[in-house]
From Swiss-Prot:
Entry protein name: Dual specificity protein phosphatase 19
Record-linked SUPFAM superfamilies: (Phosphotyrosine protein) phosphatases II
Activity modulation: Phosphatase activity is enhanced by Ca(2+) and Mn(2+).
Residue span(s) of domain Tyrosine-protein phosphatase: 64-205
Gene of this entry: Dusp19
The organism's taxonomic lineage, starting at the top: Eukaryota, Metazoa, Chordata, Craniata, Vertebrata
Organism listed in the record: Mus musculus
Amino acid sequence: MHSLNQKIKAFSRDNLRKQCTRVTTLTGKKLIETWEDATVHVVETEPSGGGGCGYVQDLTLDLQVGVIKPWLLLGSQDAAHDLELLRKHKVTHILNVAYGVENAFLSEFTYKTISILDVPETNILSYFPECFEFIEQAKLKDGVVLVHCNAGVSRAAAIVIGFLMSSEEATFTTALSLVKEARPSICPNPGFMEQLRTYQVGKESNGGDKVPAEDTTHGL
């Protein structure tokens, strides 16, 4: 008993090995959770980071490109940073709706960058006009446009679904099905899904393509 008491008194939290938990969210984000001073710290992994806990290199590449139309593609930042893959798909335009992802080949392609946060509170509808205009411009020039975000499952998918609802007069259900067939991993966050349903209601009630009045500001 005396020996046990000594060990308890000598115990120090500093002697514990630092633990970290890797978490992949429904939207495809990879996070690192660490404990420090009885508090959980969450950090998003950096593709170019080191091997330490908190910033780790993600070596898993997602190079699957969803071909929605011959001129409309959907993918991740990995696809957008693979020059050989882009040339294979004859990409001419790239719509980057990621947050904090740089455009890799400025001299090779026509870029449009719109930083969108992948959280349910973000007003995705307010970005539709600018995104749709860029896609239409690429189409009119007989180009091929790749729409991408970080993981290519939430933000970019929501933009493409909305575009099909706008330009192809597709219903939300039909557009979602078409995009999921081309890229099975898509999973727009719950807020985006609800806004896309609202977008359909607005189109039906307005008889056109207007964003509902309450959704015209950028929400975070």
